[in-house]
């Protein structure tokens, strides 16, 4: 880490992003009880799930970009790279970094597809796989705690 104290505006941005992830996890966890047929037949639910995945992953990417800029200066060149850089910096475990890089790629697919182009089976299949985001939040909080950013 740089020798400078962790800037409060950067920390606030990260903490708001963590809250967004946690809220999205709650919403998506409630949608896990839907059957595949119920999910695929309800376009409102599809929109909610897709949007929450996008918001949650964008929040994680924002966290990654903020921490990478704090730690090494230049921002990452891509969304998946932001997640891998957190692994390179020891902020995330290598496994979590790679899983979040996959999540960033999934976000790119969701953000740039619409209507009948979206494979709703792929999105439904992602619903049970929320653990990567939970672990991400834990590792980010652990890192912030380890550098004293959460003190005071």
Predicted features along the sequence, with ranges:
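Solvent-exposed interaction patches of small proteins and small membrane subunits
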Residues: 1-152
């Amino acid at each position: 880490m740089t020798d400078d104290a962790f800037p409060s505006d950067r920390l606030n941005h990260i903490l708001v992003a963590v809250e967004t992830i946690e809220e999205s996890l709650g919403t998506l966890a409630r949608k896990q009880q839907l059957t595949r047929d119920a999910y695929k037949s309800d376009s409102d639910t599809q929109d909610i799930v897709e949007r929450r995945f996008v918001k949650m992953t964008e929040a994680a990417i924002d966290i990654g970009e903020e921490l990478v800029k704090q730690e090494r200066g230049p921002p990452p060149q891509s969304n998946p790279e932001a997640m891998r850089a957190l692994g390179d910096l020891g902020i995330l475990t290598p496994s979590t970094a790679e899983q979040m890089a996959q999540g960033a790629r999934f976000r790119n697919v969701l953000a740039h597809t619409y209507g009948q182009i979206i494979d709703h089976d792929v999105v439904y299949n992602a619903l049970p796989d929320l653990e990567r985001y939970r672990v991400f939040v834990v590792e980010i909080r652990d890192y912030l705690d380890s550098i004293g950013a959460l003190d005071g």
